[in-house]
């Protein structure tokens, strides 16, 4: 099969008008992506694409497992503590970044982008999903997604102490706050340069929210909030 520069399936019988953007369309009654040149596009991608490592390995409390750790690759970060069931500050080492430097030496941003793009294409991967280095993917000319956070204007705060939410990685936002839409749009506009790239497939707003072990807990917590809370006003 022949593919265009965006990774779209270069078949003129399936081509639509070029829009300069990734869009959605139906072919044979089924939804599909179209790339900026109008060709059908199947996203065969992975999350967390980057050239500086896929994450850090915790050192705090595990020092005895390692030797000769180069402090240049050690940093303080927030990692998930399995025993405590929540995120906590810890020292961590980035072995991926260290190994990359050992094998390839110091490289410019452009060289890292070229390396990453060539590696992905060699593996048959044509797109970069959430948590990727968006600027690197754009430079590498790999279709990518942009990740932005919604506005955190206010959080659910139930009056009933028995309705305690399991907020293991983030608090639960009040999406009906009057400033929520305005502030979220401001957050999106902060990445407008990336979003306007022809290689941008689309935008994720927020990751998933903390799952609750008990069904309906979010709803009950919402109804237990003070009367002035925007969501309580909406659903009461």
Regions found by a protein language model. Name each.
Residues 1-138, 153-194, 198-202:
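Active-site-adjacent substrate/metal-binding segments within catalytic domains
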Residues 135-140, 212-215:
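Substrate-binding cleft/loops of secretory-pathway carbohydrate-active enzymes
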Residues 220-236:
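Active-site neighborhood of glycoside hydrolase catalytic domains
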Residues 50, 213, 218-219:
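Single-residue recognition of alpha-helix boundary sites
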Residues 207-211:
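Short, internal active-site loops enriched in acidic
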